[in-house]
Amino acid sequence: MSKITEKVELLAEPIVKEEGCELWSVEYVREAGTWYLRVFIDKEGGVDILDCERISRRLDPILDEEDPIPDSYVFEVGSDA
C-alpha cells in the first residue's frame, strides 16, 4: 500500500463510518495517462448512488485541504461490487 492510499484511508474511514458504510479499499492508479483516486465502500444491504454521493461530497473538500496527492487526479467513490 502506498503512502497516498494510506493517508486517504485515514481521512476517509471516519466519514465512511459516519455514513453507515464500511471502507472496502482505496486505490490510486494511472489509466490512459490520467490518475484516478478511487474509494470503494460497502454496507449491509448494498451501496446505492446516494451513499457514494454523500461520501464524495464530504470527503472531497477534506482531500482538497489535506492535499495528499501532488498530481491532478479524478476522484471517484464507488461500491466494491
Language-model features and meaning:
Residues 1-81:
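Short Lys/Arg-rich amphipathic alpha-helical segments
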